[in-house]
């Protein structure tokens, strides 16, 4: 039944879906909840204190959810609405023939991003199974696409990633997901410590491929999406930690291009039970890494700043 409804939604105009999604997103935000508190807290930590900004962010989250069925089952129609003036960044990286690691944060429409990138050649992406079993048929049916190969987020998937990169192909992943047990370190993200995955940094250092951050900005009135690309400067830092910091900094730069479309309600700063110890509460919080996509570790903020983390 859920699959039928989702397929039915795919036939509605994109502008209708996004408008309905924005209304639902605003309604969900107005209800006092953990989500509302988290959304306000995360936007404030990043320097966005304006209540109107938070409401726009909540609305864009709803639009992101509502447009997914159309992207999954009316893919070609949606791809025709993708525009970009930054395609030479991708073309230059692919021309080097050493593979490309695409990093797509929870920004804009990350569902359209992967599908657009298949226009350049085979793309292997990593996924996590849906937590709700009822959603699994929807997720599985959405992965059937030419040039798009999905692998699970486990050791098998990592091996598939390495093989694809060594063939000179492209792989893609979400770099701002909270990592699993033993796969993350605490690093600055918008001036606060966040448990940061090391997989992207390890892959980049192991394979020496081009690293490009990418996101699809949602355009108004259902006009489609604008693709953004940001290539990580080379040579990369020599250590996994420094490279992961550089990735976080580049993500901040990309997010600040259209910050209201970042998924601020995602529990990015949580501390899983199996996570390494959070930095001492007495230590100063890391400074906001700002817009620079550099590879050097960020210096700490002045003493007295507060450090935050969530469960």
Question: Can you annotate each of these PLM segments?
Answer:
Residues 10-15, 61-63, 84-86, 109-113, ...:
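Short hydrophobic/aromatic-rich motifs at helix boundaries and adjacent loops
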Residues 22-24, 28-31, 46-58, 94-95, ...:
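Non-catalytic C-terminal accessory region of glycerolipid acyltransferases
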Residues 36-38, 129-133, 193-197:
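Active-site metal-coordination segments of metallo-dependent hydrolases
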Residues 96-155, 181-185, 218, 222:
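Catalytic core of membrane glycerolipid acyltransferases/transacylases, capturing the structured
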Residues 1-104, 138-140, 145-147, 298, ...:
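Membrane-anchoring hydrophobic helices of lipid-metabolizing enzymes
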Residues 76-82, 128, 147-153, 189-191, ...:
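Short, flexible loop segments at the rims of nucleotide/cofactor-binding pockets, characterized by
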Residues 87-91, 114-115, 136-140, 161-162, ...:
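Short amphipathic alpha-helical segments and helix-helix/interface helices
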């Amino acid at each position: 039944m859920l699959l039928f409804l989702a397929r039915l939604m795919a036939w509605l105009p994109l502008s209708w879906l996004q408008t309905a999604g924005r209304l639902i997103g605003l309604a969900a935000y107005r209800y006092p909840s953990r989500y509302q508190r988290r959304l306000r807290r995360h936007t404030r930590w990043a320097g966005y204190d304006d209540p109107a900004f938070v409401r726009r962010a909540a609305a864009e989250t709803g639009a992101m959810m509502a447009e997914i069925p159309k992207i999954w089952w009316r893919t070609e129609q949606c791809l025709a609405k993708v525009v970009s003036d930054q395609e030479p960044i991708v073309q230059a990286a692919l021309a080097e023939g050493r593979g490309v690691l695409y990093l797509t944060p929870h920004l804009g429409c990350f569902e359209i991003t992967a599908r657009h990138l298949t226009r350049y050649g085979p793309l292997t992406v990593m996924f996590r199974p849906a937590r709700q079993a009822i959603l699994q048929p929807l997720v599985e049916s959405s992965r059937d696409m030419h040039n798009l190969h999905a692998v699970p987020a486990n050791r098998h998937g990592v091996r598939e990633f390495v093989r694809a990169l060594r063939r000179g192909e492209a792989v893609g992943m979400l770099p701002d997901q909270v990592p699993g047990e033993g796969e993350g370190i605490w690093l600055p993200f918008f001036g606060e410590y966040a448990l940061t995955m090391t997989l992207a940094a390890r892959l980049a250092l192991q394979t020496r491929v081009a690293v490009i951050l990418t996101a699809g900005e949602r355009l108004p009135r259902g006009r489609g999406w604008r693709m953004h690309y940001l290539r990580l400067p080379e040579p990369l830092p020599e250590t996994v930690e420094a490279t992961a910091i550089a990735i976080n900094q580049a993500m901040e730069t990309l997010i600040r291009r259209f910050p209201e479309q970042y998924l601020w309600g995602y529990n990015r700063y949580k501390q899983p039970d199996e996570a390494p110890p959070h930095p001492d509460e007495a230590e100063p919080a890391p400074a906001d890494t700002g817009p620079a996509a550099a590879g050097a570790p960020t210096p700490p903020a002045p003493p007295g700043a507060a450090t935050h983390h969530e469960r």
